[in-house]
């Protein structure tokens, strides 16, 4: 073993196993690309993205940590969301929640 080396178990790793999911159609109505990170509170994303924000409240993208989804101007794509976990408190972002969900 090399110091700092990580040896993963064999087989596939399933991300967010058992988490309930919801799929939304999202359109970028703006004239600039919008990139959303893996742990961003999706309901508070850029106002140029058009989707059902009530459904997205308390949820984040179902993608690996540290990655992002990019929406080009005029693009519509489907995204899968999962609930935020932990204390389920949201602070910052666009300051639309600032507390418990």
UniProtKB/Swiss-Prot annotation:
This is Urease subunit beta. It comes from the Bacteria. One of its GO terms (biological process) is urea catabolic process. The keyword Iron-sulfur does not apply. NCBIfam families: PRK13203.1, urease_beta. Pathway: Nitrogen metabolism; urea degradation; CO(2) and NH(3) from urea (urease route): step 1/1. It comes from Rhizobium johnstonii (strain DSM 114642 / LMG 32736 / 3841) (Rhizobium leguminosarum bv. viciae). HAMAP family: Urease_beta. Gene3D superfamilies: Urease, beta subunit. Belongs to the urease beta subunit family. Heterotrimer of UreA (gamma), UreB (beta) and UreC (alpha) subunits. Three heterotrimers associate to form the active enzyme. One of its GO terms (molecular function) is urease activity. Its EC number is 3.5.1.5. Keywords: Cytoplasm, Hydrolase. It is found in: Cytoplasm. It is an enzyme of class 3 (hydrolase). GO terms for cellular component: urease complex. Its main location: cytoplasm. It catalyses: urea + 2 H2O + H(+) = hydrogencarbonate + 2 NH4(+). InterPro entries: Urease_beta-like, Urease_betasu_sf, Urease_subunit.
